[in-house]
């Protein structure tokens, strides 16, 4: 099994990166390939070697924690490697764990390729099994029931305003403990972004 691949980024496209490891180019499918575009130095990508009878694919992650989440998602019926990669790419790990633990289908169905049936299956298969990914996890009782949909709407508004996923993730983390209206979330987020 390949634990990680280390080397300079030789090529970046929308689906994968190519790492030059001692003159051999490794094609690695990663959650957010353009994250690597800015890095000229050697990078370490923690990998999952996916083998099927007709293909072998390397999936790569910035941390072991991301890779472990990917592996856990693969164990869910109805989620394949592309779906698991999309979930890792588009979600905050702590918020995802909280949604699974609280069985928040509304949050889980926002991920690409996840419908109500798959969201229920995720909660059923993974609830209580993600503690090693979040050792300090404390359930946010009521967070998703009260305020989360407003925060989601505010984040969607920030996307429409042209803010990057990275900027929105930082703001979301800062605002996740507050319970506000959508308008108040947007105002507060803009204040944080313009500092």
From Swiss-Prot:
It comes from the Bacteria. Residues 146-195 are annotated as: Domain III. SMART domains: HhH1 (SM00278). GO terms for biological process: DNA recombination; DNA repair. InterPro entries: DNA_helicase_Holl-junc_RuvA_I, Hlx-hairpin-Hlx_DNA-bd_motif, NA-bd_OB-fold, RuvA, RuvA_2-like, RuvA_C, RuvA_C_sf. Residues 63-141 are annotated as: Domain II. Residues 1-62 are annotated as: Domain I. The keyword Transmembrane helix does not apply. Disulfide bonds: none annotated. Keywords: Cytoplasm, DNA damage, DNA recombination, DNA repair, DNA-binding. The keyword Signal does not apply. GO terms for cellular component: cytoplasm; Holliday junction helicase complex; Holliday junction resolvase complex. Homotetramer. Forms an RuvA(8)-RuvB(12)-Holliday junction (HJ) complex. HJ DNA is sandwiched between 2 RuvA tetramers; dsDNA enters through RuvA and exits via RuvB. An RuvB hexamer assembles on each DNA strand where it exits the tetramer. Each RuvB hexamer is contacted by two RuvA subunits (via domain III) on 2 adjacent RuvB subunits; this complex drives branch migration. In the full resolvosome a probable DNA-RuvA(4)-RuvB(12)-RuvC(2) complex forms which resolves the HJ. Belongs to the RuvA family. The RuvA-RuvB-RuvC complex processes Holliday junction (HJ) DNA during genetic recombination and DNA repair, while the RuvA-RuvB complex plays an important role in the rescue of blocked DNA replication forks via replication fork reversal (RFR). RuvA specifically binds to HJ cruciform DNA, conferring on it an open structure. The RuvB hexamer acts as an ATP-dependent pump, pulling dsDNA into and through the RuvAB complex. HJ branch migration allows RuvC to scan DNA until it finds its consensus sequence, where it cleaves and resolves the cruciform DNA. Has three domains with a flexible linker between the domains II and III and assumes an 'L' shape. Domain III is highly mobile and contacts RuvB. This is Holliday junction branch migration complex subunit RuvA. It comes from Exiguobacterium sp. (strain ATCC BAA-1283 / AT1b).
């Amino acid at each position: 099994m390949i634990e990680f691949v280390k080397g300079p980024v030789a090529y970046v496209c929308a689906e994968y990166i190519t790492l030059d490891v001692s003159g051999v180019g490794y094609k690695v499918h990663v959650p957010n390939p353009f994250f690597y575009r800015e890095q000229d130095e050697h990078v370490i990508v923690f990998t999952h070697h996916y083998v099927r009878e007709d293909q072998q694919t390397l999936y790569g992650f910035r941390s072991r924690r991301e890779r472990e989440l990917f592996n856990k998602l693969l164990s869910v019926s109805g989620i394949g490697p592309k779906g698991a990669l999309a979930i890792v790419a588009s979600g905050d790990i702590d918020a995802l764990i909280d949604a699974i633990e609280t069985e928040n289908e509304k949050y889980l169905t926002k991920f690409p390729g996840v419908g109500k049936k798959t969201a229920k299956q995720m909660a059923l298969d993974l609830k209580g099994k993600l503690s090693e990914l979040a050792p300090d996890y404390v359930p946010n009782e009521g967070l998703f029931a009260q305020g989360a949909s407003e925060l989601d709407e505010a984040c969607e508004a920030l996307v429409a305003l042209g803010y990057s996923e990275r900027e929105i993730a930082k703001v979301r983390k800062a605002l996740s403990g507050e319970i506000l209206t959508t308008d108040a979330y947007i105002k507060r987020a803009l204040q944080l972004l313009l500092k």
